[in-house]
Amino acid sequence: MATSLKNLSDYDKNTIPNGADFSIGIVVSEWNDHITSKLLAGAVTTLIESGVKEENIQLKRVPGAFELPLAAQWLAQTNVDGIIAIGVVIQGETRHFDFVCSGTTNGIMEVNLKYDKPVAFCLLTDNTEQQSIDRAGGKHGNK
């Protein structure tokens, strides 16, 4: 898998535009909070390091990944310039994983298209909890 070849936190910070004039919305799922909270912290830190003012970061929390598109839509209807959608779905024994991943993915895509604002897709869809932990500040960095 490509992730095993690269630390997700390694990027050239000089290629990131100055965010001082941007307002960013973040929607984060509370399900798997021990993972999503780390992804959220990484996103906020990166935004601030890129010049986005803390007061220009709007945060909405939702129960699970399936609610991410609706909250992203709520944020898109405001004055934000872009949105980050953060969630984690871990494969279980039923097809629920497939339905949640598909619905969330399609919903976020629709918000991108309808509002002509970028919605960054930070939805971990891993086979195991450990894989998600590894991608939330663990051995693979922070997605």
State the predicted function of each range.
Residues T3, D33, T45-K53, Q73-D81, ...:
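Generic secondary-structure signature for well-ordered alpha-helical cores
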Residues K60-Q77, L124, T128-E129:
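Glycine-rich oxoanion-binding loops at beta->alpha junctions
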Residues G25, Q58, D81-I83, K117-L123:
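Structural motif
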Residues E67-I108:
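Glycine-rich phosphate-binding loop
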Residues N14-V62:
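Glycine-rich phosphate/diphosphate-binding loop of Rossmann-like nucleotide-binding domains
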Residues M1-A20:
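N-terminal amphipathic/basic leader segments beginning at the initiator methionine
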Residues E30-W31, V88-V89, L124-T128:
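Short, ordered loop/turn segments at secondary-structure junctions
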Residues F97-D98, S102-K143:
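C-terminal binding/interaction regions
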